[in-house]
């Protein structure tokens, strides 16, 4: 499994609905870039200038909302993931 470093997290994207509320099926080109995901791995935290490590505010398993164009997309063992910095996370769901 991938292990993120520092204040980074690895997320699995939660795909958006393929149909509108009225039942119209959306083609891939019409779907918005996903902004929701589930954290599958989290780094050990950010290191301050003093050398002190600050733990992340999110945990593995959290569902999150993140900035629309944030992160780096990676493919690992046939699955697509997104690597984000903690500062790109806007909210935890639930």
UniProtKB/Swiss-Prot annotation:
Gene3D superfamilies: GroES chaperonin. GO terms for biological process: chaperone cofactor-dependent protein refolding. The keyword Chaperone applies. InterPro entries: Chaperonin_GroES, Chaperonin_GroES_sf, Chaprnonin_Cpn10_CS, GroES-like_sf. GO terms for molecular function: ATP binding; metal ion binding; protein folding chaperone; protein-folding chaperone binding; unfolded protein binding. It holds the Pfam family Cpn10. GO terms for cellular component: cytoplasm. It is found in: Cytoplasm. Keywords: Chaperone, Cytoplasm. SMART domains: Cpn10 (SM00883). PROSITE patterns: CHAPERONINS_CPN10 (PS00681). Signal peptide: none annotated. Belongs to the GroES chaperonin family. Together with the chaperonin GroEL, plays an essential role in assisting protein folding. The GroEL-GroES system forms a nano-cage that allows encapsulation of the non-native substrate proteins and provides a physical environment optimized to promote and accelerate protein folding. GroES binds to the apical surface of the GroEL ring, thereby capping the opening of the GroEL channel. NCBIfam families: PRK00364.1-2 (NF001527), PRK00364.1-6 (NF001530), PRK00364.2-2 (NF001531), PRK00364.2-3 (NF001532), PRK00364.2-4 (NF001533), PRK00364.2-5 (NF001534). Heptamer of 7 subunits arranged in a ring. Interacts with the chaperonin GroEL. This is Co-chaperonin GroES. It comes from Bacillus pumilus (strain SAFR-032). The lineage of its organism: Bacteria, Bacillati, Bacillota, Bacilli, Bacillales. The gene is groES.
